[in-house]
Amino acid sequence: MTVIQPVALRFMVGARTLASVRRRLVRVPLTLAEARQGACPELPPLPQEAQGYLITSLPETQHTALGRAGMLGAVRQRYTRFHIDLSLGFDAWFAGLSANSRQGLKRKARRIDAEVHRFRTAEELAIFHPLARALSARTYQERLLGGGLPDDLAGLQRLAAADAVRAWLLVRDGRAIAYLCCPADGDTLLYAHVGHDPAFAAHSPGAVLQLEALRDLFAEGRFAWFDFTEGEGQHKRQMASGGVACVDLMLLRPTLANRALIAALAGFDGSVALAKRVVRRLGAEGIARRVRRG
């Protein structure tokens, strides 16, 4: 069944959305396995009420192959879809990180002096969810990106009944300061819901919790892959064992409004890219980062 979703096409500077325009699109997401295989998806017929497609994690090598006659194409994002091969074993994976990364992670873990709590059953997730949900409400992921932990505890418990979710909390002095909640897609665990208390940002609680979660996953042996999903970031790049060059490709019906929208997005994104280059030349990255996050 083809699902049509309202998609907000955002005019963004860093994590800050300045404006957005909505289009009803058929979303075609590729899994990590499909991206790694270099797959080119077969698009479903476009319903009359839909204005186009949004294909996510399309291997960059398939970008031109997916062109559809008469449709307007626009790349919304280019990134590496990072992942970790969990068959490597913890020691081999950790040895594959840069020396600076290894030393930094060890130092952060010692400095933060916190406990890791682990959750996988339906009963355990009933304890995890309210604590993580309260923490999520304070994170920039939820406040600025709308990417917080969902309210749906029942959904998490259904996943737990199928042994298809893992979750962790980092707790310091009885207070949850970071959470990680990862549903599974077959043998792949997804980096889906993550956040930390802004008051502890200087201690890198998310990185510390991620390291301990990976230690658990390597030891458990239940999953073959850890998927950092769409988009990039220093944290993902630092910990990944590999990645696939991907694009998010939007295909729209060739209406006048859609032509104007694509031109506006291209012009705005080009201006942001130019501004970033100027900021780098001036050495003002720190100031720009604070402005983007507000």
Regions found by a protein language model. Name each.
Residues 1-21, 58-84, 88-202:
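A conserved beta-strand-loop-helix scaffold within acyl/acetyltransferase catalytic domains
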Residues 2-18, 22-24, 70-91, 224-283, ...:
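Active-site/acyl-donor-binding loops of N-acyltransferases
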Residues 12-74, 186-244, 251:
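Acyl-donor binding region in acyl/amide transferases
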